[in-house]
Structures are given as structure tokens and as C-alpha cells.
Amino acid sequence: MAKTIYNYWFIQFDFPDENGKPYKSSGGKMSFCNELNREIPQNWNYTSIENITICLDSERIPLSNQQREGMKGSIPYYGATGIMDYVNRPIFSGNFVLLAEDGSVMDDNGNPILQRVSGDVWINNHTHVLQPVKGYSCRLLYLLLKDIPVSIIKTGSIQMKINQANLNNYNILSIPDAIRTQFINCVEPLDTKIMQIQQENNNLIQFRDWLLPMLMNGQATIED
């Protein structure tokens, strides 16, 4: 639903105008933006990823399999595409958007592999760790990043990599403050629900991974 609203507002540009009507469909004026290579609402502008994000890559710490074996716990350990393990302490706490840096960096549509994470986490050095600047939200940042074509910002063909400089320099739509705030207020309850469900799924996966070995070696049984 958040993606649908985003597309309606910032791809089709039918966000509510001052009369509550869809802007472009109601005759809202558009102008061509050379930097974005598309039409955008008149008097809107562009910005770069660097201007809307705080990059925390310097705080990442990779752990080897052996190191993680000695640190087993309940804190998710994130890699480029998802949770790789669970450890006994976090190095990050808060709300973040992760963008895969190397290895698997692109989904089937040619867009970045992203993860929206929250709470206490450990993150390795194969994914960029981003937070939005004031006035943006993690969900809006996630949606803006998801529209980036990886082919423009990647280096390498066999071993692809998205370096910090290429990511920072990529130009995106600059959304006016009032409309951005309205959008965030609209999708924030959806984001909260998504994160709650994601946490529940992670808890179930962790419980499954603990229970299955117990069942297989006879340490646990299921009664009828």
C-alpha cells in the first residue's frame, strides 16, 4: 500500500493539490527536469542521495563464522540480502535502511536490494547503513532508493559493487516540505505495521531454526 501511494504521488504526480484534487490529472503544471530526465511539477527541484541521508558505514563490523559461533544470541546479524545469523549484542540501535553494497546488489527489476530494519541489530560490511535526515522517514527513503536503476550506480560486471560515492551523487526528486510531511503522516502507520509483522516473522524464523535441530536429534518431541 505504501508503494502504491508513493507511485500515485511521486511517479504519476497525483498528490493532493491545494484543493485536495490529484495534481497532474487536474491540470497541474509540469516542467522538464534535465537532471532527472523527466517532467516534474513546476517549481519542484532535484537533490542528491547525499543530501537526504546519514551514512553509518564506518560503524559496521564484519564477523567471521567462527566469531559468530562464539557470540550466539537473539540479535539479528544482517548481510547484503537479509539476516545471516543471530548474535548476543548489537552495534546499532534505531531505524535504518540497508542498501546492498557488493555481491548481490540488484533485484529482478534492476533496482537495489534494500532492507528496512529497526531495533537492536548487528550489520556487516556488505550493505550500506543509511538513516534519513530530519524531515524524511525511513519508509520514504526506502521508496526513493527503490526507484534507482542499479546499472547507473554500480561498478564491475561480474562482481558488482555500489560504492558510497556513486550512491551519494545520484540525483533524485526533491519533494517540497509540506507535501513530504503529508505523505509521511499518511504512510507512517503502514510502516509501523510492516515493521511489527517483520519482527514477528523474524521471531518465528528464529524459533523454527532452534526447534528443528531439537526435534531431529530427539531432544524435543511433539505430542498428539
Q: Where are the predicted features?
A:
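Structural beta-strand/beta-sheet cores of well-ordered domains, especially the beta-sheet scaffolds
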Residues: 11, 42-45, 59, 73-76, ...
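A short beta-sheet element
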Residues: 79-83, 89-168
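A general structural signal for short secondary-structure junctions and capping/turn motifs
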Residues: 53, 65-70, 87-91, 119-121
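Internal hydrophobic scaffold segments of catalytic domains
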Residues: 1-10, 85-90
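Short coil/turn segments at secondary-structure boundaries
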Residues: 20-25, 63-70, 155-159
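Alpha-helical scaffold segments that mediate packing/assembly in large oligomeric complexes
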Residues: 4-30
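Proline-centric
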Residues: 39-42, 127-135, 150-152, 165-193
